[in-house]
Amino acid sequence: RRKKEEPCTDIPHDRFLMVSVGSLIPRKGFGRLLDCCARLKAEGFAFRLLILGKGELETALHEAIRTNHLEDTVQLLGFRTNPYPYIAAADLYVCPSYVEGFSTVVSEAVVLGVPILTTDSSGMKEILGESEYGLVTENSDEALYTGLHRMLAEPETYQHYQQKVKERASFFSLSR
């Protein structure tokens, strides 16, 4: 729990804040997450997405951010030794992966009490149930978009998951 309390001065929190952490590789789904962000921004939603990680797609993702005019919405922050302050500051943790094992970072978001939206890949339902403790969407681009749209447009849906993730956090412990 101490790691989440370390000071982090580069987290802008002037609007709904989404965070995603992972290697910038194709199976992690960051390209489709940026596509969803472009659609949501075009629809007038105010939010910010911080992506923490490094990898082979870094240049392509920077280009997609420029092409889709997302410079004021999406930031690639690179690798961070301690991602906890970013996750803890988030309004929503997003896991857009095509393929994922048991996700340590999703478990960490649960422990930190951060609502989660994830695509359905291995291990997610073990952590979140059938969308009981976090929104688990079909593993498709459109379902990811729809889930993000719901979290931004439906305060009752967001608040529901805000409460449920706190219930689920009681099953986990950071001290292990």
Predicted features, each with a name:
Residues E108, S121-S131, L135-V136:
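Short acidic/histidine- and often glycine-rich active-site loop of Leloir-type glycosyltransferases
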Residues P115-T118:
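Short hydrophobic beta-strand element within catalytic cores of glycosyltransferases
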